[in-house]
Amino acid sequence: MIQQQQKFELLESLLWEPKNGYFLLDRHLQRLERSADYFNFPLSLTEASKALQALSMTCGSVKQKIRLTISCEGNIKLQAHTLDSGILKIGASVGIASQPIDSQNPFLYHKTTYRLPYTMALESQPQYQDVFLWNQDGVITESTIANIVIDTPAGLITPPVKCGLLPGTFRSQLLEEGKIREELITLDDLHSTQNLFLINSVRGWIRLKKEASRDVWKVVSNG
């Protein structure tokens, strides 16, 4: 399957802050290394770290979103962009993808520039800014840009990685800290969920609230 994909690069998106530097840098580099091993990409973490350090000296005094890519030849490319509110601005709508994803697809477990499963999901519901993905077993996995966390009476839960989702760095940190726990989330569970969050290491916590009588969730706070 991997050989059938168009040429792709490994990808990490990092938050850089003037006072704190790169958020969860070690976790990003560890995930990058795992993906390089899986896809057999040459990777020098030393060179990647040096490149990130050099870039940080030019980032100025405002938050930046850093895009790090590694080619199949091991070439490192960095881009910095001033952090804005992204596609999930206050009032943005998130729906449910019309078709399931295949949890056996290895690209769901690794962050790369190959995003066909995500673009297809978005194109299936073009009226929304983002959509929740679900697998062949009717289990919720993530959105196209973030991990999902549901607020339940028993605490905050997020789907296990085995369901077919990216092991987000912020998600991993929250699990380690005991702030969230893994539990299956079915489509039925989602239908009845009023309050939930989308999380990633660049945006932090994005809070959503369900609209009355519709399977649509609106962003009510961002970051």
Task: Describe the function of each predicted region.
Residues 1-65, 69-223:
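Helix-start/capping segments and mature chain N-termini
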